[in-house]
A protein has these predicted regions:
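C-terminal beta-strand-rich structural cap/linker in extracellular carbohydrate-active enzymes
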Residues: 999-1021
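Sec-dependent signal peptide cleavage junction
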Residues: 23-47, 52
């Protein structure tokens, strides 16, 4: 087995997308060295070069007025690469930045920022304007390190001088050649002639890279007999002078040829690109048509097709026709409550359901739902205040979008209300049926519970004829100005949740006032829409994870959301790591994910309640007899030895723990000594012998495996455990055309439903059990959730396959091991006792901050959907300082936790740190509570908050962090942090030193660089 190399992820070129990206970051490295230089010796001037079009500007990365920090440097660019000025800014890694100074524009507004860059592998950067909030972007790789690529995003600039900063966020960023800026909103009123045709080969179009005009086979029937092909490796085709008489929404029909499924990114007027996966045509001589909607401004427009560094279809022509209107009509959202007089009602415990002349109301103790049967729209209110208005449902069936509002009949029958009792409690199920001639029935289903602050909403599409299929079912959609209004405007945020914990993904608490590049901010499975100041807010998310990957798209302004779509069928290269579309769910009846919607006085309570709602559907994995149910304590090999693991090192570690840490670093006598990847450096006999030594020392042995990945390239290699019946070429996951899916993280995905895959798992895991291992870390599980063509014909989606594969693992292990999911989706969650809350942590201060970002917004998983949240190991010797090493211990202790060290015990400095930092009884007791601390603040963007709190019976614990290498003073409002009276006296005990102090109202904490503090807090009456 080989561990992945993080910097060289090996993604397939042809499937790199620049649109529909969930925000993810590498990691944040605090405490830069402070080195700051100005680019010197550049041939270009710092001033902008005004382009031919008004409102366009170009700035060179090597301009003398720019500022470089950290390792950033100006270097030469190969002549063949074609860098403007012959130079680039490179070395953007490990805490470096490039700032373009004096970006001067005449007009304030939204500008399209085009970055000309070079990146031989996929890399990211953070962009901030005028010192404002930093946004993260994931750039696709260019063909190689000698090929330029282009990436577009939108920024808001003020009139006059501006600064634009590119930050590597502690990771690795591309080399930057230059940036171009173009005013985006320079159009006026006006629609094109219906059905206007624009040829790809037209003389005024602009082709870049490999793109070229070529002949088209006569049988294909291309208009004009020609097409534009070779859209690969960083090429573009731009249609110029797309004329519109008035601004509005238009249907764009793309006539194309593609013998295999290929994506293409499309941008209008140099705006944000959106990626579309065009289905394959019958062959490379057959035309296909793909239709979508775009917004055009009055006058001349441009439409650009970009291969994103991969492979895109050949383009014959475009046809543009008016779609009608200037945007989607939200419907009569302000008249939803006009439903006439009440006709009849029934009570079900504390829930009252009332039928009205033109609608119905469903009312619980906490909330009410009003459904208008004339408009097909719903409104949700809590405590008498409407927070959501204009809610409806949609489903994409092949090329037909079903919209519940557009059905001719919306019916509700009181007699059809069902009493229910399930894991959520007692309640009712209410169904609204939408019917139209010639369309399948769409059912909107609400489940209300007597004792829950949330309700559940889902949808079904039911066909009386042929089966229907969809990979986009949205039971909750809002498209109305101010459609979601939580009623406050202190510091309104939307939480963006990553699908898994791979590639150093981060959560983001983004300002609700985000209306640009929103495809970058799709949240996976759940979100919170809240005011950080008052903490009130909505929590919305899926509670069923048997079929769908759920996405949440949103857009907002003026402290409200104008768009919200919660849908099953979400895939993204950077979030779910899928390289093809979500699988289609087919049947006479197809059902969406079930979505919980709740409002809370404290969004943190809401997130925990959301976790409980999921556990009500799929409880966390139980501890079977013989598996200790307490916090796992011990050691893992990866941080210490990586690929150099050996039998002698395992024995040395086991002996060291017995001789030095047995009495202090343990959970009631249980200590795990775990071998990570490269355990197969040991022979079978050495593995058996190592387990014997570990057990003799009074410890338990742990092991590692990646059940859904293949690290090799030999598709003829026999699969172990199958007696030669299957090769890896048989069990790797493929697309519908039979093509092997590209590597992700350097590994091929294995089909969890294939019998060869399952036999492999049985063969390896039964050996582990036979050797005597009692703990297993299973890694790269996200590969098992990829969309593809699975062996089991009943499996239509990646999540269905994942459920099957994980259930098979549980069955094979038979409850005899502690199961820790490492790189894994957050959901489904019922197959592991613990899950890593973040990606790999190497012990440095920057990685600790990154890990605590995941705790800041993901703590609620602890004790709800997982018994424990795993902060990854503590490699103390890599902290860089004693303070940073101690901070790593504090971070692990408050995280929920799997309490594992990962130091090289032959290193004298590591030994000292282990003996000093792993033996504090009071600190270890906090870790053994097994509860994750809550964040005090939730307004940190992609960073971690610096104050966390845990209430333990009558007492509290408080953790305070300094993520920089400079001294810092933290002032903590005790009422906000602990909820205590402003006049209450509080006794603080420093957990590490035992020092006591008494304070009230606020606490001032003086921290050295990289230092953190843990306090026990007693509130005196």
């Amino acid at each position: 087995m080989r561990r992945k190399h993080w910097a060289l992820s090996g993604k397939g070129l042809f499937l790199l997308l620049t649109a529909v990206l969930l925000v993810q970051t590498a990691f944040f490295t605090p405490g830069q060295s402070g080195r700051e230089i100005h680019a010197a010796g550049a041939d270009t001037e710092a001033a902008a070069v005004v382009q031919a079009a008004a409102g366009s500007y170009s700035y060179e990365a090597e301009a003398a007025g720019n500022t470089l920090t950290g390792k950033a440097e100006i270097k030469a660019c190969k002549e063949a690469t074609g860098c403007s000025g012959g130079q680039v800014a490179g070395g953007l890694w490990g805490g470096s930045s490039l700032t373009f100074n004096d970006i001067t524009v005449e007009t304030a507004g939204v500008y399209t920022l085009t970055v000309h860059y070079i990146s031989g592998d996929p890399r990211s950067f953070g962009v901030s304007v005028n010192g404002g909030t930093k946004d993260h972007y994931d750039l696709p790789k260019t063909a190689d390190w000698d090929t330029l690529g282009v990436y577009e995003l939108e920024v808001e600039l003020k009139a006059g001088a501006n600064t634009i900063r590119f930050d590597d966020e502690g990771g690795y960023s591309p080399d930057i050649d230059r940036i171009d800026l173009r005013l985006s909103d320079n159009g006026g009123p006006g629609g094109p002639v219906t059905g206007t045709v624009y040829e790809a080969e037209a003389a005024n179009n602009v082709l870049t890279g490999n793109a070229a005009v070529s002949g088209c086979a006569a049988a294909t029937g291309c208009s004009g007999g020609r097409k534009v092909g070779n859209l690969w490796g960083g090429s573009t085709l731009q249609f110029r002078d797309i004329m519109a008489e008035k601004a509005g929404v238009y249907k764009l029909s793309i006539y194309y040829i593609s013998g295999d499924p290929r994506p293409v990114s499309i941008s209008v007027n140099d705006g944000a690109s959106e990626n579309y996966a065009l289905p394959k045509t019958e062959n490379w001589d057959t035309l296909g048509v793909f239709t979508l909607e775009i917004e055009l401004k009055a006058g001349a427009n441009t439409i650009t097709f970009n291969d994103d560094g991969g492979w895109s279809p050949d383009i014959d022509k475009l046809e543009i026709a008016a779609a009608g209107g200037g945007g989607e009509d939200p419907g009569p959202v302000d008249n939803i409550g006009v439903i006439g007089k009440a006709l009849d009602s029934d009570k079900y415990g504390s829930i009252k359901v009332t039928k009205h002349e033109k609608g119905a109301t469903f009312v619980s103790r906490s909330y009410s739902i009003t459904f208008n049967t004339e408009s097909g729209l719903a409104a949700y209110a809590w405590n008498g205040k409407t927070l959501v208005k204009g809610a409806y449902a949609s489903a994409q069936l092949e090329d037909k979008l079903l919209d519940s509002r557009q059905y001719t009949e919306h019916s509700f029958k009181l007699k059809d209300v069902e009493k229910i009792k399930d894991g959520h409690g007692k309640g009712v199920r209410i169904t609204v049926e939408n019917r139209s001639e010639g369309l399948p029935v769409m059912k909107q289903i609400y489940q209300l519970y007597e004792d829950q602050p949330y309700f559940l909403v889902s949808q079904q599409v039911v066909s009386s004829g042929a089966a229907v299929s969809s990979n986009d079912m949205a039971p909750l959609v809002v498209n109305a100005s101010g459609g979601v209004d939580i009623g406050t405007g202190g510091d309104n945020r939307v939480l963006i949740t990553p699908f898994d914990n791979d590639m150093w993904s981060r959560y983001q608490a983004r300002t609700i006032n985000t209306a640009l590049n929103n495809n970058n901010y799709i949240s996976s499975e759940m979100t919170a829409i809240y005011d950080n100041t008052s903490r009130t807010g909505l929590v919305i998310g899926s509670v069923t994870h048997d079929v769908w990957k759920t996405g949440i798209y949103w857009s907002g302004s003026n402290d409200k959301l104008n768009k919200l779509k919660v849908y099953g069928g979400f895939t993204s290269l950077t979030s779910t790591h899928d390289t093809i579309d979500h699988g289609k769910v087919s049947g006479q009846t197809i059902t969406s994910p079930q979505i919980a919607v709740g409002y809370y006085n404290d969004y943190r309570d809401g997130l925990e309640n959301y976790g409980e709602a999921n556990a009500a559907v799929a409880p966390p994995l139980k501890f079977q007899k013989g598996v200790p149910s307490g916090v796992p304590v011990g050691w893992n090999s990866w941080g210490a030895y990586e690929s150099s693991l050996s039998y002698d090192k395992v024995v040395e570690v086991s002996n060291f723990f017995k001789e030095n840490l047995k009495k202090s670093f343990t959970n009631d006598g249980t200590v795990y000594i775990n071998m990570d990847s490269y355990w197969d450096n040991l022979s079978e006999q050495q593995l058996r012998d190592a387990v014997k030594v570990i057990r003799k020392n009074g410890q338990k042995a742990g092991i590692y495996y990646g059940p859904f990945v293949y690290w090799g390239d030999n598709m003829s290699q026999p699969v172990e455990g199958t007696n030669g019946k299957y090769t890896y070429g048989d069990i790797v996951l493929r697309d519908a055309a039979g093509n092997i899916l590209p590597k992700v993280d350097g590994a091929y995905a294995i089909d969890p439903t294939h019998p060869g895959s399952q036999q492999r798992v049985e063969y390896v895991f039964k050996k582990f059990l036979d050797y005597g291992f009692e703990y297993i870390k299973i890694d790269f599980l996200t590969h098992g959730s990829f969309e593809g063509k699975h062996y089991d014909p009943k499996v239509q989606t990646g999540i269905q396959a994942y459920n099957q594969g994980m259930a098979h693992i549980n069955k094979t292990l038979g409850g005899k091991m502690f199961i820790s999911a490492s790189i894994a989706p957050m959901f489904p969650s019922q197959y592991a006792h613990a899950r890593r809350i973040s990606c790999d942590i190497d012990g440095t201060l920057g990685r600790t901050e990154y890990q605590l970002n995941n705790l800041t917004y993901g703590w609620w998983q602890n004790g709800t959907i997982y018994a424990y949240t795993d902060p990854d190991y503590m490699t103390l010797a890599k902290g860089g300082s004693y303070n940073a090493a101690q901070t790593r211990v504090n971070a692990a202790a408050i995280s929920g936790t799997v309490y594992m060290n990962s130091d090289d015990v032959s290193n004298v400095e590591a030994q000292k740190l282990m003996k000093s930092l792993l033996t504090n009884k009071s600190v270890n007791e906090i870790a053994l509570i097994g509860e994750a601390f809550r964040p005090v603040e939730g307004n940190t963007g992609t960073a971690a908050t610096d104050v966390f709190v845990l209430q333990d019976k009558k007492d509290y614990y408080l953790a305070v962090f300094n993520y920089t290498n400079e001294a810092a003073v933290k002032t903590i409002d005790l009422k906000r942090a602990l909820g205590v009276s402003a006049t209450a006296k509080v006794e603080l005990t420093d957990v590490w030193t035992g020092t006591k102090a008494e304070v009230k109202d606020s606490l001032q904490v003086n921290l050295e660089g990289a230092q953190s503090k843990l306090y026990k807090v007693k509130v005196k009456k």
